[in-house]
Amino acid sequence: MLRVTLSRQLSTDWNDSVKVGFIGLGNVGAKLAGSLLRNGIDLVVRDLDPATTQQFRNSGAKVAQSPREIAETSEVIITCLPSPSVSASVMEDPDGVLTGLSEGKIWIEMSTTAQQEVFRLGKKVEALGASFADCPVSGGCHRATTGNIAIFAGCAREVFEQILPLLVMMGRHVLHTGDAGSASILKVVTNYLATANLVSISEALVTTKAAGLDLATAYEAIRISSGNSFVHETESQVILNGSRDINFTMDLVVKDISLFQEVAEREEVPLELSPLLIKIFRDAEQRYGPREWSPNVIRRLEDATGLDIRANGFPAQIIDQEPEALGQEVVAARD
């Protein structure tokens, strides 16, 4: 169920008046920050890679020398970082965000992180008179490029209304998931499901090849059937091409599904599949390296069978074909 967002005029007002700081210009962060810049936001960025920050400087953004400077000069501070430990460091170091934060500002955490870390850091933010929201994204790096990715927002409704004009610049579908921390749980839930799908697709494609069937035909059979999925329509294509490039690495998968497992263990849910997925990806990470593209988990079966799971006619990278547009709030249907 979709609801039209706040007016475009409100978004225009943000363009003219609000300074936004963005920390973390990695695979996803750079794309989200780029969407803000394209929409005319007064943006200041911070990243450890000087080449990346220079690209943003060339496109009109300002570059800060520390997270503290970002917090001091921005009204909204966005972080998009690779792990909970990095997020903690960026927030709590002597030159971190917390040292520059003040009353009335908003911290938006767009990293995939643990709910407990969101709560812990959020309390420190609130103690300074500022507000916070956890807003992880889902849908693949290719959709982040065009501003068509999905965004989950866990925060007070009042805070959500304040930041919605920014969120719809970065994402096509924006869902207010409830209180702070709720979005972080749903993010790792969706990543767990995507991981399970990737492993099952890998097994399906290798088994299909072993049975002597054409892989391009198998791709179409799955696509038009009950076995289809978002992961199949995207990641299967780069698997069959051989590039395996979806801008997402083994170590990030291990982090995300481990966070999901932590949630289940905390709530005393006796999962069976999740521990197996962690074992599979840790093995793949050890074999092929933590920075290997995650679809290369299929190499475990390619190595075991001697089969080459490639086919002609598939792209090396997934490109989002949907035109960029201002996003919308998604509203959960309730009686």
Where does each model-flagged region fall?
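NAD(P)+-binding Rossmann beta1-loop-alpha1 motif at the extreme N-terminus of oxidoreductases
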Residues: 2, 6-80, 105, 110
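Helical "substrate-binding/catalytic lid" subdomain
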Residues: 182-305
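NAD(P)-dependent dehydrogenase/reductase Rossmann-like domain
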Residues: 286-335
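Hydrophobic residues within alpha-helices
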Residues: 32-33, 121, 166, 207
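Rossmann-like NAD(P)(H) cofactor-binding subdomain of soluble oxidoreductases
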Residues: 69-72, 76-77, 81-149
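Rossmann-fold dinucleotide-binding core
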Residues: 14, 20, 25, 112-192
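Hydrophobic beta-strand scaffold residues
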Residues: 43, 63, 132-133, 174, ...
